[in-house]
């Protein structure tokens, strides 16, 4: 990407129009347009000012690496406006470039170890349950709660990023260079919903849907089955129930890292509770607005660790400076003092 293209991408990522950026900088919109079109290269002082306004490091404008992204699949509670979608796309691109750059600096190649297409070919709800179980088996996850979903995905070669995005955005999945899957999730999301979104996007990556099965519904079922295998759901709740208390859902949420609402949905789809019982419980959830904000202590968010570990390794081995490490971490302090204290 040229400097002009990077200015445009950073502006879109910041959610600013050319006119808004020009106003912030005390310039004309025409000047910004000329910068973005490559007609004029802004002097260093303007680039520094621009980087501060757009929330990027000035080195971003001179970054050599760029990526080709496939059309992303968004998971949102309501459709994103075009401006919002462009903003999310630009932020993901900027994060991924930093991720790939530190891999390049270290000569690190991530091995992608996904289950085969045959493993994930599904044509029915039972097939989805079986596929989720096979994925757990291939990844040696057993039947216990998954401690950290992000770590599991990163360990198998999927790049996982967390970005600031509109409230309605949950997650997106895409490929870069046609062969490496990437999942990005909203930074402002409770841990239980974040984990479900990651598992849902994993479903989109893996499932080979056949027989008229709805892809979105299949990914939703896969996410629940991946987080809580049906054998364990029956063990926790029993085979048949006439009622389940909210307190049970709350305790299971913190044990398994899956929301109370998802547990209610899981109990219904496995036939543990009847349709009428599920409707009564959903009414209770709606009355208390628990579908918007669940009661009690929220589940902590997960954070990707692979990129930070690579940056710290490069810093420890003197392959990058502290300021470069901070730039690669998106402005976050690398914690060099902490590293040196050990």
Residue ranges, per PLM feature:
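Active-site hotspot residues in diverse enzymes, especially metal/ion-binding acidic/histidine motifs
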Residues: 1-342
């Amino acid at each position: 990407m040229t400097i002009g293209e990077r200015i445009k991408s950073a502006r879109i990522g910041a959610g600013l129009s050319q006119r808004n950026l020009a106003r912030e900088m005390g310039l004309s919109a025409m000047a910004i347009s000329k910068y973005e079109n490559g007609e004029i290269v802004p002097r260093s002082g303007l680039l520094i000012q621009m980087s501060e306004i757009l929330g990027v490091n000035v080195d971003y404008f001179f970054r050599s690496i760029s990526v080709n992204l496939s059309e992303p699949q968004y998971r949102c509670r309501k459709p994103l406006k075009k401006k919002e979608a462009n903003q999310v796309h630009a932020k993901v691109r900027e994060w991924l470039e930093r991720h790939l750059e530190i891999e390049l600096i270290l000569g690190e190649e991530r091995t992608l170890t996904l289950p085969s297409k045959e493993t994930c070919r599904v044509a029915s709800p039972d097939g989805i349950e079986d596929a989720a179980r096979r994925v757990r088996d291939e990844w040696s996850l057993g039947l216990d709660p998954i401690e950290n979903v992000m770590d599991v995905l990163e360990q198998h070669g999927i790049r996982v990023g967390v970005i600031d995005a509109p409230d309605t955005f949950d997650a997106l999945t895409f490929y870069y260079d046609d062969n490496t899957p990437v999942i990005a999730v909203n930074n402002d999301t409770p841990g239980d919903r974040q984990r479900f979104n990651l598992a849902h996007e994993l479903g989109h990556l893996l499932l080979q849907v056949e027989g008229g099965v709805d892809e979105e519904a299949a990914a939703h079922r896969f996410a629940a089955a991946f987080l809580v295998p049906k054998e364990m759901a029956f063990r926790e709740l029993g085979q048949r129930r006439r009622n389940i208390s909210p307190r049970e859902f709350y305790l299971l949420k913190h044990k398994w890292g899956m929301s109370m609402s998802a547990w209610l949905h899981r109990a219904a789809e496995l036939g543990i509770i009847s349709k009428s019982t599920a409707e009564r419980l959903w009414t209770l959830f709606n009355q208390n607005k628990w579908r918007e904000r669940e009661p009690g202590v929220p589940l902590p968010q997960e954070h990707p660790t692979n990129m930070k570990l690579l940056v710290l390794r490069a810093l420890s081995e003197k392959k990058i400076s502290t300021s470069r490490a901070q730039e690669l971490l998106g402005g976050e302090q690398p914690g060099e003092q902490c590293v040196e204290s050990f």
